[in-house]
Design a protein with these regions (language model features):
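Active-site-adjacent helix/loop patches that line small-molecule binding or acyl-intermediate pockets
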Residues: 1-74, 117-120
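A penicillin-recognizing enzyme superfamily signal
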Residues: 12-16, 61-62, 66-67, 71-226, ...
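Poly-acidic low-complexity segments
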Residues: 28-30, 107, 276
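Bimodal feature
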Residues: 40, 130-132, 251
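Repeat-unit-sized solenoid/scaffold elements
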Residues: 44-54, 190, 194-196, 237
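Low-complexity, Gly/Ser/Thr/Pro-rich intrinsically disordered linker/tail segments
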Residues: 218-279
Length: 279
């Protein structure tokens, strides 16, 4: 995206909340495919079949968000979150116990790739400053979230043994912070997550430590860092595959009669023009 750092790795786009990258990704994958994946990850809320879902146009509860994010920590296995796992009587006898229903929705390599990319949020992105201020030094994958009027803030934090989500907001959207400086997820929700995790780490009986690390799947081949330094902007020439970026083709001799007939949505994004996502 021109004016936003040129070509960006997905890890960096997530780390710095570069939303046009998310829009382009859904444009390439197709909104219907993204919605189907969300359904596989336990999301039941209504989702519009257009590119606005990249910007958070759907009202998804923190409950369903956490179920989806925890799938990445479980290496592709979705486990429906439960409010109550076990009920015991006064003598400790188990009256009822919920057995988790585990469903594989993606392979471990893809799930870990998401973990790898979201680690940038905590390491050097939107969550890094607050985590450092709180003295939390652990392997964390996460994502901050903020509504455009600063009335809602989120942070989903994934550690190797625990996924936790925090939402701060109001039922009445007219109530909000004056600025994103105070109203962003990294300032509203992340501190709550941090205080909670410090309590978790302090309780040794839980077996959760800041020294825990994510285990890489055996078939995980690494990242796309070899693409850095190739030059150009992500919006030059429209959407391209990795092979097309590595091995660009020479432009063909075209009369260009239809070049401007259907203007690419990415050009509008780069010029900050209004977009009709229902076309």
């Amino acid at each position: 995206v021109k004016g936003s750092g040129g070509m960006l790795m997905m890890k960096d786009a997530l780390a710095y909340s570069k939303n046009p990258v998310a829009v382009r990704l859904i444009e390439a994958a197709g909104a219907k495919n993204v919605i189907q994946l969300a359904r596989d990850l336990g999301v039941t809320e209504e989702m519009k079949d257009n590119l606005t879902i990249a910007l958070g146009s759907s009202d998804i509860t923190i409950y369903e968000m956490l179920g989806a994010y925890s799938t990445f920590a479980n290496y592709g296995n979705y486990i429906k979150p439960e409010m109550i796992w076990r009920i015991e009587d006064a003598n400790g006898r188990v009256i009822k116990e919920i057995k988790p229903n585990i469903r594989e929705v993606m392979n471990p390599m893809h799930a870990y790739s998401m973990i790898y990319m979201m680690k940038g949020v905590a390491a050097y992105g939107t969550a890094s400053s607050e985590l450092k201020r709180m003295g939390i030094n652990a392997e964390i994958a996460g994502k901050t979230g903020t509504t455009d009027n600063n009335s809602d803030g989120w942070f989903i934090g994934i550690t190797p043994k625990l996924a936790t989500g925090v939402w701060v907001g109001w039922e009445d959207r007219a109530t909000h912070f004056w600025s994103t400086g105070e109203g962003q997820g990294a300032r509203m929700a992340l501190p709550i997550w941090g205080y909670f995790m410090k309590k978790i780490y302090a309780d040794k009986s839980l077996g959760i430590s800041p020294k825990d690390t994510f285990e890489k799947p055996s078939d995980w081949t690494g990242n796309c860092s070899d693409l850095q330094g190739l030059g150009g902007y992500g919006d030059e020439g429209g959407l391209r595959t990795i092979d097309e970026i590595r091995n660009p083709k020479q432009p063909s001799n075209s009369n260009g009669q239809n070049e401007n007939k259907n203007e690419n949505i990415n050009d509008k994004i780069n010029r900050s023009e209004d977009i009709d996502f229902n076309q």
